[in-house]
């Protein structure tokens, strides 16, 4: 596992409100040096989310999808299904820009 890797997520039961439900992918956004911790920080994706400056569009398994950096979550690695490869460098840079915007981090 590494930062920028895309995994099929195993959805939890009982989502509420605006939490993402159903089958989807997640992008690992946690720094590689901390991947040995008991959880991993994931940004879920959605093909139905509305466009926004903080939702970079990436291609996963031949389909355009948006990375929902405003819905980051720490998940147990057992919730990660099959790997679907890595985001490209430009895609990962766009995710980083969105994280800076959503988290209010200065560059």
Map each language-model feature to its residues.
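Conserved functional hotspots at enzyme active or ligand-binding sites that engage polyanionic ligands
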Residues: 1-107
């Amino acid at each position: 596992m590494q930062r920028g890797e895309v995994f099929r997520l195993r959805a939890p039961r009982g989502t509420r409100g605006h939490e993402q439900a159903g089958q989807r992918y997640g992008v690992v956004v946690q720094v590689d040096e901390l991947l040995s911790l008991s959880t991993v920080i994931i940004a879920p994706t959605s093909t139905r989310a509305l466009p926004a400056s903080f939702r970079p569009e990436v291609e996963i398994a031949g389909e355009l999808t948006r990375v929902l950096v405003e819905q980051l979550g720490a998940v147990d690695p057992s919730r990660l299904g099959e790997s679907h490869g890595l985001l490209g460098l430009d895609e990962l840079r766009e995710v980083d820009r969105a994280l800076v915007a959503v988290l209010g981090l200065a560059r």
